[in-house]
């Protein structure tokens, strides 16, 4: 179908006979600016204000505006509360053993809590703390805490460290005990993020396990070794 705004002789004839409407002229920058200013003028002044500014300027509005302001203020307040609730945490906090029950087991309803039991003398624990600090900032809706293991469990063996527990509504929904379960000595941030997302503690945007590629390479290498071993065995048999 032919574009009615296209500059063709046929379209011009149709315009002259009134069959097509006059061609729309492109708006220049000044006209665009005027339109934008007109649209901005239609916005009520209070719609650009913060809650604090609304409080200071409320004497300057008429009765009709005040009613609208109350509705608008309530809307802004609810948006602010929702944002604060979502961004409630945002850091890896240190707690002691006597805070465990209140901070972890009895945390508020439907809240995910990730706790890391650690010792500073265990290098892998320091790696996990570093990764959890990053994840706490990335997922502020989840509570991330750490505690020196001696303050929570006496005589806990170093072989069981790092230990990560994931709680929700007082129940352990996931646990990673020891270096292997936590992801190995070369644990990457994305790998720990994947582990926590698998148990539901965070909503990650990772689409697959970051370690999958490494695992596939290892399987491929093992298969290649097996093939070479088979070829070698066959050659030895023929030689005999």
Swiss-Prot record:
Q: Name one GO cellular component term.
A: endoplasmic reticulum
Looking up SUPFAM superfamilies in the UniProt record yields: Thioredoxin-like (SSF52833)
A Pfam family found in this protein is Phosducin
Q: Which GO terms describe its biological process?
A: acrosome assembly; flagellated sperm motility; sperm axoneme assembly; sperm flagellum assembly; spermatid development
Assembly, per entry: Interacts with the CCT chaperonin complex and actin.
According to its UniProt entry, this protein's organism is Mus musculus
| Localization per Swiss-Prot or TrEMBL | Endoplasmic reticulum
Descriptive protein name = Phosducin-like protein 2
Keyword Endoplasmic reticulum included in the entry's annotation: yes
The family note in this entry says: Belongs to the phosducin family.
Which terms are listed as keywords in the entry? Answer: Differentiation, Endoplasmic reticulum, Spermatogenesis
The cross-references to Gene3D superfamilies, in alphabetical order and at most eight, read:
Glutaredoxin
Regarding tissue, the record states:
Testis-specific (at protein level).
Which residue numbers delimit the Phosducin domain?
A: 38-201
Q: What happens when the gene is disrupted?
A: Male mice are infertile, show severe defects in spermatogenesis and exhibit lower testis weight, epididymis weight, sperm number and malformed and immotile sperm. Show dramatic abnormalities in acrosome formation and in proper sperm head and tail development.
Protein task: Essential for male fertility, spermiogenesis and acrosome formation.
Question: Where is the segment annotated Thioredoxin fold?
Answer: 89-240
Q: What is its main location?
A: endoplasmic reticulum
Q: Does the keyword Membrane apply?
A: no
């Amino acid at each position: 179908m032919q574009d009615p705004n296209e500059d063709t002789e046929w379209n011009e004839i149709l315009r002259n006979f009134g069959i097509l409407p006059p061609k729309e002229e492109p708006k220049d920058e000044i006209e665009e600016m005027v339109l934008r200013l007109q649209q901005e003028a239609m916005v009520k002044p209070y719609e650009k204000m913060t809650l604090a500014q609304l409080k200071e300027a409320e004497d300057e509005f008429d009765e009709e505006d005040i009613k609208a302001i109350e509705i608008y203020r309530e809307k802004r307040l609810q948006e602010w509360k929702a944002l604060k609730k979502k961004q409630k945490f945002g850091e890896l906090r240190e707690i002691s053993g006597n805070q465990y029950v209140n901070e972890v087991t009895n945390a508020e309803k439907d809240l995910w809590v990730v706790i890391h039991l650690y010792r500073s003398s265990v290098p892998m624990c320091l790696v996990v703390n570093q990764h959890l600090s990053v994840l706490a900032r990335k997922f502020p809706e989840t509570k991330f805490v750490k505690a020196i293991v001696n303050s929570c469990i006496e005589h806990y063996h170093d072989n069981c460290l790092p230990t990560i527990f994931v709680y929700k509504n007082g129940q352990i929904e996931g646990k990673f005990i020891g270096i292997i379960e936590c992801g190995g000595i070369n644990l990457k941030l994305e790998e720990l993020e994947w582990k926590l997302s698998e148990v539901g503690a965070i909503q990650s945007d990772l689409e697959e396990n970051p370690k999958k590629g490494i695992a596939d390479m290892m399987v491929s290498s093992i298969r290649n070794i097996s093939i070479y071993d088979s070829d070698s065995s066959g050659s030895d048999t023929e030689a005999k």
